[in-house]
Amino acid sequence: MSQHLVPEAKNGLSKFKNEVANEMGVPFSDYNGDLSSRQCGSVGGEMVKRMVEKYEQSMK
């Protein structure tokens, strides 16, 4: 299991992951063994994209 830089952020990141997956139509659950690498990667990529956009907006 991976370790988070900020352990307190784990719940927030899980919630964010589920929100993004739902918006993209990817059926995330506690067990994601049925999902393709492409589906998982697209959710993770979208999460990173949104986090970077949010950070860039805060820099303005």
From Swiss-Prot:
<feature type="site" description="Cleavage; by spore protease">
    <location>
        <begin position="19"/>
        <end position="20"/>
    </location>
</feature>
<dbReference type="InterPro" id="IPR050847">
    <property type="entry name" value="SASP_DNA-binding"/>
</dbReference>
<keyword id="KW-0238">DNA-binding</keyword>
<protein>
    <recommendedName>
        <fullName>Small, acid-soluble spore protein C2</fullName>
    </recommendedName>
</protein>
<dbReference type="InterPro" id="IPR038300">
    <property type="entry name" value="SASP_sf_alpha/beta"/>
</dbReference>
<dbReference type="GO" id="GO:0003690">
    <property type="term" value="F:double-stranded DNA binding"/>
</dbReference>
<dbReference type="InterPro" id="IPR018126">
    <property type="entry name" value="SASP_alpha/beta-type_CS"/>
</dbReference>
<comment type="function">
    <text>SASP are bound to spore DNA. They are double-stranded DNA-binding proteins that cause DNA to change to an a-like conformation. They protect the DNA backbone from chemical and enzymatic cleavage and are thus involved in dormant spore's high resistance to UV light.</text>
</comment>
<comment type="similarity">
    <text>Belongs to the alpha/beta-type SASP family.</text>
</comment>
<dbReference type="GO" id="GO:0006265">
    <property type="term" value="P:DNA topological change"/>
</dbReference>
<dbReference type="GO" id="GO:0030435">
    <property type="term" value="P:sporulation resulting in formation of a cellular spore"/>
</dbReference>
<dbReference type="Pfam" id="PF00269">
    <property type="entry name" value="SASP"/>
</dbReference>
<keyword id="KW-0749">Sporulation</keyword>
<dbReference type="InterPro" id="IPR001448">
    <property type="entry name" value="SASP_alpha/beta-type"/>
</dbReference>
